[in-house]
Curated annotation (Swiss-Prot):
Keywords: Unfolded protein response. One of its GO terms (biological process) is endoplasmic reticulum unfolded protein response. It comes from Saccharomyces cerevisiae (strain ATCC 204508 / S288c). The keyword Zinc does not apply. Induction: By the unfolded protein response (UPR). Present with 721 molecules/cell in log phase SD medium. The lineage of its organism: Eukaryota, Fungi, Dikarya, Ascomycota, Saccharomycotina. This is Unfolded protein response-inducible protein 1. Disulfide bonds: none annotated. It comes from the Eukaryota. The keyword Repeat does not apply. GO terms for cellular component: endoplasmic reticulum.
């Protein structure tokens, strides 16, 4: 091969590898600079990488996060971090006692109200303060002055889950 052919081949390889990396930018694993010495990221590093994934969709739509290759505890840690980050809520924030349930359930086990708006997973009778709640939580929710609810969906371990939060009394 002539030097020109080698240069062209190398350039094509670089372009191909770059294109593949762009296509894989949605993977939940952190970039190499966030990984530990052995190539394994800590929980915090994985969470940082996951939360840095851009997403412009509405909170009630599916954000596809593939965590199937992660250990279950790491994946659940990331999920909790994502919820807290996205809704700007923690257990000691404006709405205390937040809890998160999987599988499409809303509210606590003592909450016997039925889900009567499956399209948005909101309780229509609670929409009077929805604007205030959206400003507080930056997400879809339904709330009164003392109570807020909402949800989003993720794909974890190949299963679509509706993650809901409920706070207040």
């Amino acid at each position: 091969m002539t030097p020109y052919a080698v240069a062209i081949t190398v350039a094509l390889l670089i372009v191909t590898v770059s294109a593949l990396q762009v296509n894989n930018s949605c993977v939940a694993f952190p970039p190499s600079n966030l990984r530990g010495k052995n190539g394994d990221g800590t929980n915090e590093q994985y969470a940082t990488a996951l939360l840095s994934i851009p997403w412009n969709g509405p909170p009630e739509s599916l954000r596809d996060i593939n965590l199937i290759e992660l250990e279950p505890q790491v994946a659940l840690y990331l999920l909790e971090n994502y919820i807290n980050h996205y809704y700007n809520t923690t257990r000691d924030n404006k709405c205390p006692n937040n809890h998160y349930l999987m599988g499409g359930q809303l509210g606590s086990s003592s909450d016997n109200r039925s889900l009567n708006d499956p399209q948005t997973m909101l309780w229509p009778e609670k929409k009077e303060d929805e604007k205030n709640c959206q400003e507080t939580f930056k997400g879809a929710c339904s709330c009164t002055k003392r109570f807020c609810k909402g949800y989003f969906s993720v794909n974890i371990f190949g299963i679509n889950l509706n993650i809901s939060y409920s706070s207040g009394k």
